[in-house]
Amino acid sequence: MKLLFDLFPVILFFATFKYAEKSPELAASWMGSLLGFVPDDIKLAPILLATVVVIAATVAQIIWVHFRHGKVDKMLWVSLVLVVVFGGLTLAFQNEAFIKWKPTILYWVFAGSMIFSAFILKKNPIKAMLGEQLTLPEPVWGKVNLSWIGFFLFMGALNLFVAFNFPTDTWVNFKLFGGMGLMLVFVLGQGMLLSKYVEEEK
């Protein structure tokens, strides 16, 4: 359930785009009703409408977490800021390039924060999260942390490659299924590599 909740804005973005893609004219009409303007290029209506929805969904997600748990994770705030800024630029300039950059910036913010924590603060964020569940040698914790940094850097670059070398609908598919699929494969791979340490501990 938590995974679905975390993916809630992305799922709505995907669903809105796919629905609006079938009738750009209707999407443009909804844009006029919601924001008071119709896109200059009707072909952009699906991605612009999906951008409006993902901004609203992310705001709703923050509000729900705040009232349900009282505390909102910092990275969720970062995601909100990025989607509002890049989504707002997308709508203001009617240019989908801005919203396509958003996932990359988010991935690289994750990587940058982990680099800062590891090399400046001398703290391992992965160990801080999983240290109570796993007992690993320090060099292994370091490798796990570096692997996550590398993964986020790679995902950011891959998002740009897909976003600007393939049609928008391909990028929208990748944003949900590609990103989630690669994350799942990576996490499973990490689990397999770390399982031997869990067995040794037993």
UniProtKB/Swiss-Prot annotation:
Its main location: membrane. The chain crosses the membrane at residues 47-67, 75-95, 101-121, 146-166, 174-194. The lineage of its organism: Bacteria, Pseudomonadati, Pseudomonadota, Betaproteobacteria, Rhodocyclales. It is found in: Cell inner membrane. Keywords: Cell inner membrane, Cell membrane, Membrane, Transmembrane, Transmembrane helix. Pfam families: IspA. Plays a role in cell envelope biogenesis, maintenance of cell envelope integrity and membrane homeostasis. The keyword Transmembrane helix applies. It comes from Dechloromonas aromatica (strain RCB). It is a multi-pass membrane protein. InterPro entries: YciB (IPR006008). One of its GO terms (cellular component) is plasma membrane. This is Inner membrane-spanning protein YciB. Belongs to the YciB family. It comes from the Bacteria.
